[in-house]
Amino acid sequence: MSDALKHECGVAHIRLLKPLDYYKKKYGSTFYGINKMYLLMEKQHNRGQDGAGFASIKFDVEPGERYISRVRSVEQQPIQDVFSKINTRINDALDENPLLKDDVSLQKKHIPYIGEVMLGHVRYGTFGKNSVESVHPFLRQNNWKHRNLILAGNFNMTNVKDLFNNLVELGQHPKEYTDTITIMEKIGHFLDAQVRKIYKDLKKEGFTKSECSPLITKRLKLSKILKKSSKDWDGGYVIGGMIGHGDSFILRDPAGIRPAFYYKDDEVIVVASERPAIQTAFNLKLDQIKEVPPGNALLINKAGELNIKEILPPTEKKACSFERIYFSRGSDADIYKERKELGKLIMPTILKEINYDISNSVFSYIPNTAETSFYGMVESVDNYLINKKTNEILNNKNISKEQIVEVLSERARIEKIAIKDVKLRTFITEDSSRDDLVEHVYDITYGVIKKTDTLIIIDDSIVRGTTLKKSILKMLDRLGPKKIIVVSSAPQIRYPDCYGIDMANLESLIAFKALLSLLKQTNQYSLIDSTYKKCKKQELLPDSEITNYVKDLYSLFSAEEISTMITSLLSTDVTSAEVKIIFQSIENLHKACPNNLGDWYFTGNYPTNGGNRVVNNAFINFFEGNKKRAY
């Protein structure tokens, strides 16, 4: 992807179902769970590089002994830093007391991080500061085991303000205004309430205070707590939690916006945001891993029993299509096929644009995430050539051997043109100097482009277009092609996201800039004022009654008109070559990714009522010149 875009976080959860000495005997290590957690998190490092965290709970320890361990990091390589700290503590303990080496019970008693249930997180920050205090898992502590709550998740709520105010109305004083703290305190409130109720019931039944604790853990109903906690949530989420006594849960939003997968056998229960992470870490086949159903929670009690319960009624499934285009690892079998299909489906538009002149066209891609869609594009052009050659031979009954060789020798010219050279550090604040550095983020391969060539280069998506304008187009133009065609395997990104992607401002989106330019060009810019007034009028309406009026502005122009204006905005005064930017259609996106139909950033069709609130706020912020977040 050419535009830097922060996005989804990643969740990892392991529940060991056997005693720790089982793993020591079978796998040679008491630290089996920790090692698997490292793999799960490392295989999801694409989902978060701002921070990483790990927490574990030990079962059945004596009073006075620590049973919860947590470590978090915002270092340059946070996952490695987290597990380096864990390994250092383990190795130091083993060095200081050699008796621990072969005694699992002593290891559990004296070494932190060893536990039966673990929760990990990799973070990209879209809300809050990027400090270690902002890194999951979060911990809500209490002297009662069953009132300790550890929380980590991949989520963004659109109605944080309302949820925060609800807590204040309950008499609470949340320590931060963030969705994570708000969600944790919401769950914590109903956890406390249920514990108090169970305790009162047990006292009435004649149990002593010390007898109550273990009985509370057996009577606690996580499903009830989650139903009460989540009934007002509006957003996309996968939230993982652990209760101090050993219960744990994973809850997914009703529209299935955020992804979650799980696996269970007689040794372990595993949950992760991405399927390949589980496949690789546990050497599994595709069909052994299941998807967490939308609106449902995986509930794992201390006894190791897994139940899947509906917490919220599932709505129409709108799983995020950007997961398939860009965010998730391309090693997933289905995602790999879908990205190839995106490349295949856009090829007819490309062929039309080059007037079917394959001989004078060179095909390439922007590294690295567009590589798979590039393979699909190449496969499609190969299929076109096969049909063309077949027809040429069949339609010429007098064709000679030399002519057959000439026909068969036509091939698509495939070259590696763009090379991602450096990860730019913006340590220079002067705009002109920084822009010069941005221009060199990518390097190019010289000597393969002729002046008569059209260079076709595919990217997975175009969000803001900054790198395209300041670096990629200038760089490609140096090669001297007649024409440059930039292909986006995704449709035009027209609307802000509010479920975990760093695209909250309308005015930063190149498609919205193109819309504004078209309104000016066609003397319709006054519609901006009238749209602003409509948006202001509905500021105080309930989310369910808000209309997305920005859609009306886009409806004035065709997708082709907007693409042409995007081309003009990004290429004017930048290149000598003619430039054309082509975007995927919404229809082809849905064909390629039939199980991930969440397309609100392309269409403005938000899967929750809060989405319309966000786009309404985003337009008001744009009009008023307010840079604050829209939710």
Please place each PLM-identified region on the residue numbering.
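Extended, hydrophobic alpha-helical segments in both membrane/secreted and soluble proteins
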Residues: F363, A370-M377, I414, T445, ...
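Conserved short alpha-helical segments that host acidic/polar catalytic motifs at enzyme active sites
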Residues: M1-P293, L299-V362, I366-P367, G376
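PRPP-dependent phosphoribosyltransferase catalytic core
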Residues: S230, H245-D247, R252, K264, ...
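Conserved PRPP/pyrophosphate-binding segment of the phosphoribosyltransferase/PRPP-pathway fold
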Residues: Y336-S432
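Active-site proximal loops enriched in glycine and acidic residues that flank catalytic Cys/His/Asp
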Residues: G241, R252-D253, S273-R275, K302, ...
